[in-house]
Amino acid sequence: MKRTIAIVAGGDSSEHDVSLRSAQGIKSFLKETEYVTYIVEIKGTKWEAHTGNGLRAKVDLNDFSFIDNGTKVKPDYAYITIHGTPGENGILEGYFDLIKLPYSTSDVLVEAMTFNKFALNQFLSAQGVNIAKSVLLRKGQAARPTDKDIINTVGLPCFVKPNAGGSSFGVTKVKHAEDLDTAIDKAMAESPEVIIE
């Protein structure tokens, strides 16, 4: 009997479409003789299984099932291809743990820790791992360090990126001090926290 694999894609970040392309690639690699595969697209609270011929079915979040051609489908495994939230920060993994569905990524704690770049750096530093000096900025922060203080801490060139997010959007390599504010604004458009390293 073939196992049913849900290739979970989309997500809530700017990398939604990139994730869908990744899912298509994975689907093409899985042998149809061994697996029944569905792409399950997530965008906010809208979860839909692509059931073929452009049709989609709403996913029942009670058990991650959906109806395909009159038959209830409950995947045996979730292959997570979401770039960013909720696939790389532990949220989706926590849901799958609750419904006891095996999945392809690390567990909740590892995903949550590694998704937050600043928290991971602090953890690794405490373990004796050398890490780059960094500054964390938060949207609406009352007392933000000056550009001069940031550059004195991390040096130039530096990288400005969303603290919790992928590595494709909102990332800038800053070579000149006058470009720092623009880079921070770009990263803040992707995440309420920005890390500068």
Residue ranges and their predicted role:
Residues 1-109, 113-115, 119, 138-146:
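ATP-binding N-terminal substructure of ATP-dependent carboxylate-amine bond-forming enzymes
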Residues 3-9, 13, 21, 113-197:
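Active-site nucleotide/adenylate-binding loops and adjacent lid/helix of ATP-dependent enzymes
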